[in-house]
Curated annotation (Swiss-Prot):
Biased composition (Low complexity): 173-184
Acidic residues: bias regions: 163-172
UniProt function note: Has deubiquitinating activity towards 'Lys-48'- and 'Lys-63'-linked polyubiquitin chains. Deubiquitinates 'Lys-48'-linked polyubiquitination of RPS7 leading to its stabilization. Exhibits palmitoyl protein thioesterase (S-depalmitoylation) activity towards synthetic substrates 4-methylumbelliferyl-6-S-palmitoyl-beta-D-glucopyranoside and S-depalmitoylation probe 5 (DPP-5).
Coiled coil: none
Highest rank taxon of the organism: Eukaryota
Lineage of producing organism: Eukaryota, Metazoa, Chordata, Craniata, Vertebrata
UniProt-listed Enzyme Commission number(s): 3.4.19.12, 3.1.2.22
Gene Ontology MF term list: cysteine-type deubiquitinase activity; K48-linked deubiquitinase activity; K63-linked deubiquitinase activity; long-chain fatty acyl-CoA hydrolase activity; palmitoyl-(protein) hydrolase activity
Protein name, per record: Deubiquitinase DESI2
Active site residues according to the UniProt entry: 30, 108
InterPro entries reported in the protein's UniProt record: PPPDE_dom, PPPDE_sf
Location of the protein in the cell: Cytoplasm
Originating species: Pongo abelii
PANTHER family reported for this sequence: DESUMOYLATING ISOPEPTIDASE, DEUBIQUITINASE DESI2
Length: 194
C-alpha cells in the first residue's frame, strides 16, 4: 500500500452511563487510531512494557463487554508507510508503558492524540478526553472507576502473551544454564557428598 492513508479516530462509549451523561457533555470514552486497516490504542497494566495494543478497527467486542462503538472521526491523512507507523508505535510504546497509565495525565485518549499529531499533525477533538479534565478537578474519581476501564480485554490478552513470551525465554535460559551446570558438574572432585 502507498502513502496518503486516512487517519481515523475510533471512539467507544465505555459504559452504559454514557447514555445519560453524554447529553450534558460528560462522557467516558476510549479511543484508538485507525490507519492502514489497523487500530492502535493504549491501556494500563501493572508491567513496565508497552501498553499499546492493536484491535480490529471499530471492534468494541475485542475491548470488552463494557465498551460500545460510538463513532469514527476522520482526522486527516498521513504519508507515512505502514512500516514507518509500526516503528512510530513501537517508539511511542517506550513512553506509553502499561504501568505509566494515568486517568488524568496519560490515558488512551492522550495516546490517540499523540499518535494523531505525529501522523497527520492534528489533535483529537477535546470532548473525547473531557473526563481527564474533570477527574483532575475531582481527584478521587479515578479510585471510583471499575478496574476493567483501565485495562481493556484486548490489552489483557496482549499482556498475557507478553508475559508468556517472557516466561518461555526465562525457562529456556534456565534450561541452558542447567545443561551447562550439569556438563560442568560431571567433572570429578566438583561436588562434596554429605
Amino acid at each position: 500500500m502507498g502513502a496518503n492513508q486516512l487517519v481515523v479516530l475510533n471512539v467507544y462509549d465505555m459504559y452504559w452511563m454514557n447514555e445519560y451523561t453524554s447529553s450534558i457533555g460528560i462522557g467516558v470514552f476510549h479511543s484508538g487510531i485507525e490507519v492502514y486497516g489497523r487500530e492502535f490504542a493504549y491501556g494500563g497494566h501493572p508491567y513496565p512494557f508497552s501498553g499499546i495494543f492493536e484491535i480490529s478497527p471499530g471492534n468494541a467486542s475485542e475491548l470488552g463487554e463494557t465498551f460500545k462503538f460510538k463513532e469514527a472521526v476522520v482526522l486527516g491523512s498521513t504519508d507515512f508507510l505502514e512500516d514507518d507507523i509500526e516503528k512510530i508505535v513501537e517508539e511511542l510504546g517506550k513512553e506509553y508503558k502499561g504501568n505509566a497509565y494515568h486517568l488524568m495525565h496519560k490515558n488512551c485518549n492522550h495516546f490517540s492524540s499523540a499518535l494523531s499529531e505525529i501522523l497527520c499533525g492534528k489533535e483529537i477533538p477535546r470532548w473525547i478526553n473531557r473526563l481527564a479534565y474533570f477527574s483532575s478537578c475531582i481527584p478521587f474519581l479515578q479510585s471510583c472507576l471499575p478496574k476493567e476501564w483501565l485495562t481493556p480485554a484486548a490489552l489483557q490478552s496482549s499482556v498475557s502473551q507478553e508475559l508468556q513470551d517472557e516466561l518461555e525465554e526465562a525457562e529456556d535460559a534456565a534450561a541452558s544454564a542447567s545443561a551447562a551446570s550439569t556438563a560442568a558438574g560431571s567433572r570429578p572432585g566438583r561436588h562434596t557428598k554429605l
